Structure formats: C-alpha cells, structure tokens
Amino acid sequence: MKTIVGTQTDVIKELTAQVADALARKPEANIAISAVDLPVEVLDALAASDIAFDKATLFQACEYCGEAGKGAHAVGAAFSPLTAAKPFAAVHAPDPDADAEHAADYDAAIQAAGGLDLVILGLGERGHVAFNEPGAGFGEKTHIAKLAEVTREAIAADFGTLAQTPEQGITIGIHTILGAKKILLVGFGARCAKAASATLTGRPETFIPASFLQLHTDVEVYLDADAAAQL
C-alpha cells in the first residue's frame, strides 16, 4: 500500500488529483464512496473540483437500516452537496429496507454495471471501513451489519437518544471492496493513529477490517501527521 502523509490540505489535493486521473482514464467509471468516517473536506473538495462526473456512476457504500436510512441524518444525506455540484450519470444506494436475503442484490447491481473502478473510504478509529465493524469477515459482500455500541454512541446525537439510534446498517463488504480496481483510504486525526498503524503494519485480521486492504494491489492511504504518528 502506498502511504501519503502531509497536511490535510495537501493530502486532499493529492487524493483529488488521483480521482481526476481515474475519471480522465475512464469517464464512465463506477465509484463507491463511504461517507462514514470520511472527512467531510474530501467530499467538499470533490464538489469544488473541476472533475466531470457526468458519465460516472456513484455507488453509496453504506446506509442505516430502516427509517434512519431515509431521513435527514441518513448517510446518503452527506452526498447531497457533491451530487448537487457534480451530477453523476447514475447514483445508487443500498436499500435501507433490504433484509439479509436481499442485501447482496446490491453486489449484483455493482457487477451488472461492470464492477467498481474506484472505492473511497474513511478509516474508522477501530480500523473499520464503511459499516464493516471489527470482526467483519473477509469474504462478505453487501450485508446487514450490527452497529457496534461505540458506533451508535458516536452518532446518537443525530437521532436524539441512543434508544432512537439505528442498530444496523447495510454495507458493501470487504469482498466487494477488494474487488475494486483501486482503493483510496483516508484517515485524519490522532483518533486514527492506532488504526492506521494496525492497517499498515499489522497482519490482515478481522478485528481490523481495514487491514484486509493489504491484500489488494492498488491501495493508497492518505493520512495527516496526527494519524501517521504511530507508523
């Protein structure tokens, strides 16, 4: 995995350049983005860029299950500024009402579109990516994931109380992510330092889902100085 360390401004600029290059090579690219743990500045930079996404297809990487996945605090709401500024040829999102049996239909849609060309992920402080929480299996495709209590506590303010906070999410799995041609992983802040170290220097293991990215041949990891402090 290639690691890029610098100021947040510099690494976002480099990431944006990589996205621009991918779209220049293949304007009709299929791109999966997880807004979970992805610094909002990344989406802002893409929205403000001169990249043309009008021939590309966006696949939202994860969403809360049930009504939480349809309201103002749905994960998909984070994409509104990007899709307003940069219309895509098509935008797809996991069905928040899908059950376990039908969750993998999302993978079928991805494959029907020709597979993923690019995946952009945020690094969670426990090494999770999208809603692939610690313990996520290497072979999982899109699936219903139980959200860890610490995850629910982190988002509880959006939903009023912990009791009202979603308990499950639907997410593309590690298998789906590793099927992409290129992966960009972003981690900012000291809270990501331990996870970044485990992801880059540890062995691939289920308790650090991001560590499975070591098995891919084209991954770039973007860190600020605080996130890279334990490397």
Where are the language model's segments positioned?
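Class I SAM-dependent methyltransferase SAM-binding "motif I" and its flanking Rossmann-like core
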Residues: 130-174
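Glycine-rich N-terminal segment of FAD-binding domains in flavoprotein oxidoreductases
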Residues: 24-48
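A glycine- and small-aliphatic-rich helix-loop capping segment at beta-alpha/alpha-beta transitions
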Residues: 41, 45-53, 79, 134-143
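N-terminal glycine-/serine-/threonine-rich phosphate-binding loop
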Residues: 1-31, 100
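ATP/nucleoside-binding phosphotransfer catalytic cores, i.e., glycine-rich phosphate-binding loops
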Residues: 175, 179-231
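Short beta-strand segments
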Residues: 32-34, 60, 94, 120-123, ...
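A glycine-rich beta-strand to alpha-helix segment
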Residues: 29-33, 38, 109-136
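Ligand-binding beta-strand-loop-alpha-helix segment within the catalytic cores
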Residues: 53-120
